[in-house]
């Protein structure tokens, strides 16, 4: 089935993935493409609408990202956001200027609710601004649709041309009625029907996998996390016993995790699960390595080598399944965006892979979408709602060199923290919570004796999709109990700190 599609052209803004997520929440499928995608390719896809994202550039910069001007003549509705809004005005004959001061944060805005873009909205509300340049004069044939105290043209458009621009960011939660604005664009202006659903995604992926794989054997990288679990069950549903799940126990897992994975997938789902004990191999490869990017690359490479070796025992295996999801791709660098950190499912892969093809059935989904797919597939709630755990495991939660002793310390600390959070019923409120073993030692006093031991950091955040996150406000008495148990029961730890940094500026993981 061919779904209606909206194309999001990426100009390098920080909220671009949120735009895609908001569109999908409306039941409309969308894809993010680089801003310099050839117009012919866009036309070939027959999109219902096009969205220009924000970005850090100015339209007057020498190498500013631009589009083919003919895009405004193909009859497809366009919505420009922030930089995209300025680009539309600039290309169509308007004037863009630079403000004396940057406008950033929540701003009162007044809408022309007669416009199809703002139908159903109150005449005034709050929006989120983040810009220096602004549209000073409109292109011919366009009208002002919204304004703020400092931005006379906060939105403009042409009902006839179906081209609209907004200087603010409707995709962020700080903009009141932002989702309604996006819905209005999709349904009132683009004429979308909203035919993209989780159930149809599953059916299409199953058919696609069967078509690609046929009767051949497939190896799946199974870790027991949400992503790899959903990927494994989805592929198993498509090809059954031709799927061989390889579970690599690299010694970097949390307490009791390896045993739980085998019990669930081999026992409950009756899958072919091959367990590989590779603890010594990974520790040897990580010996002396301190740089987090090197850790990720080494772990990714060792993973693939183990898969190759195990797959060779199965005969001719051409396909490898991985649980890569959209934020993995985003943070590893998409289009012109900068790389934040390498993910073992993306940038951590070695250049030479002996498998003919990597199958990533969840590559286009955000985490919340992956969870919904998992529920549809009948995966137990305890797995579907499991908090994210990075592929490199505890290796990137140990700052500095990874050793067996440090792993044992971190496992115990992490287990104590997770146990207490679950006992208090906070596990469903918090997106992710874990411990980090820092490379910092500090002086302490225990039993009238001086100690000089490790400092551990506790990290807990609230989020929806992992793209942005805020630190969780865990009650002090809970943190106190966790801290007391850690320093009293875990050897070589004498200090516990709590990380209160949001994302951005920090990432959720420390490495």
From Swiss-Prot:
Pfam families reported for this sequence: GATase, GMP_synt_C, NAD_synthase
InterPro entries: Class_I_gatase-like, GATASE, GMP_synth_C, GMP_synth_GATase, GMP_synthase, GMPS_ATP_PPase_dom, NAD/GMP_synthase, Rossmann-like_a/b/a_fold
Keyword rRNA-binding: no
Superkingdom of the source species: Bacteria
Database matches in PROSITE patterns: GATASE_TYPE_1, GMPS_ATP_PPASE
Enzyme class per UniProt: ligase
GMPS ATP-PPase domain sequence ranges: 196-386
Pathway in which the depicted protein is active: Purine metabolism; GMP biosynthesis; GMP from XMP (L-Gln route): step 1/1
Signal sequence, start to end: none
DNA damage among keywords: no
Cellular component, GO, one term: cytosol
Binding site for ATP: 223-229
Record's catalysed reaction(s): XMP + L-glutamine + ATP + H2O = GMP + L-glutamate + AMP + diphosphate + 2 H(+)
GO MF assignments: ATP binding; GMP synthase activity
Job description of the protein: Catalyzes the synthesis of GMP from XMP.
NCBIfam families documented for this protein: guaA_Cterm, guaA_Nterm, PRK00074.1
HAMAP family given in the database record: GMP_synthase
Protein name in UniProt: GMP synthase [glutamine-hydrolyzing]
Annotated organism of origin: Caldicellulosiruptor saccharolyticus (strain ATCC 43494 / DSM 8903 / Tp8T 6331)
Top-level taxonomy: Bacteria, Bacillati, Bacillota, Bacillota incertae sedis, Caldicellulosiruptorales
């Amino acid at each position: 089935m061919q779904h209606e599609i909206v194309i999001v052209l990426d100009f390098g803004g920080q909220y671009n993935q949120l735009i895609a997520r908001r569109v999908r929440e409306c039941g409309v499928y969308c894809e993010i493409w680089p801003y310099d995608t050839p117009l012919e390719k866009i036309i070939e896809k027959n999109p219902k609408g096009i969205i220009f994202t924000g970005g850090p550039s100015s339209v007057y910069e020498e190498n500013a990202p631009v589009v083919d001007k003919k895009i405004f003549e193909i009859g497809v509705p366009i919505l420009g956001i922030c930089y995209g809004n300025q680009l539309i005005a600039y290309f169509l004959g308007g004037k863009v200027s630079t403000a004396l001061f940057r406008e950033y944060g929540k701003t009162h805005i007044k809408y022309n609710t007669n416009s199809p873009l703002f139908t159903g909205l109150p005449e005034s509300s709050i929006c989120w601004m983040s810009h220096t340049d602004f549209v000073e004069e409109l292109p011919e044939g366009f009208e002002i649709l919204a304004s703020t105290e400092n931005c006379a043209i906060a939105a403009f458009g042409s009902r006839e041309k179906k081209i609209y621009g907004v200087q603010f960011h409707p995709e962020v939660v700080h903009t009141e009625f932002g989702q309604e604005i996006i819905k209005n664009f999709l349904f009132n202006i683009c004429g979308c029907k909203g035919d993209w659903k989780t159930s149809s995604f599953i059916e299409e992926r199953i058919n696609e996998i069967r078509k690609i794989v046929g009767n051949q054997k497939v190896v799946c990288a199974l870790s027991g996390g949400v992503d790899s679990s959903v990927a494994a069950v989805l592929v198993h549903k498509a090809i059954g016993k031709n799927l061989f799940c390889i579970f690599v126990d690299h010694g970097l897992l949390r307490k009791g995790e390896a045993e739980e994975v085998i019990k669930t997938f081999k026992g409950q789902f009756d899958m072919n699960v091959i367990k590989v004990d590779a603890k010594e191999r990974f520790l040897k490869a990580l010996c002396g390595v301190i740089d987090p990017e090197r850790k990720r690359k080494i772990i990714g490479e060792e993973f693939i080598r183990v898969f190759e070796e195990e797959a060779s025992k199965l005969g001719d295996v051409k396909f490898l399944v991985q649980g890569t999801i959209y934020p993995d791709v985003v943070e590893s660098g998409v289009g012109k965006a900068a790389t934040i950190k390498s993910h073992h499912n993306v940038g951590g892969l070695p250049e030479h892979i002996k498998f003919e093809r990597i199958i990533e059935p969840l590559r286009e989904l955000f985490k919340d979408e992956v969870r919904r797919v998992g529920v549809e597939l009948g995966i137990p709630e305890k797995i579907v709602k499991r908090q994210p755990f990075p592929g490199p495991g505890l290796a990137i939660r140990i700052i500095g060199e990874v050793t067996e002793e440090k792993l044992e310390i971190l496992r115990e600390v992490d287990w104590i923290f997770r146990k207490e959070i679950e006992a208090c019923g906070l596990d469903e409120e918090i997106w992710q919570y874990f411990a980090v073993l820092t490379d910092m030692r500090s002086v302490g006093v225990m039993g009238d004796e001086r100690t000089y031991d490790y400092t551990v950091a506790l990290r807990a955040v609230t989020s929806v999709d992992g793209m942005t996150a805020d630190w969780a406000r865990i009650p002090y008495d809970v943190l106190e109990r966790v801290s007391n148990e850690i320093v009293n029961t875990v050897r070589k730890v004498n200090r516990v700190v709590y990380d209160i940094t949001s994302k951005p500026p920090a990432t959720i993981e420390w490495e």
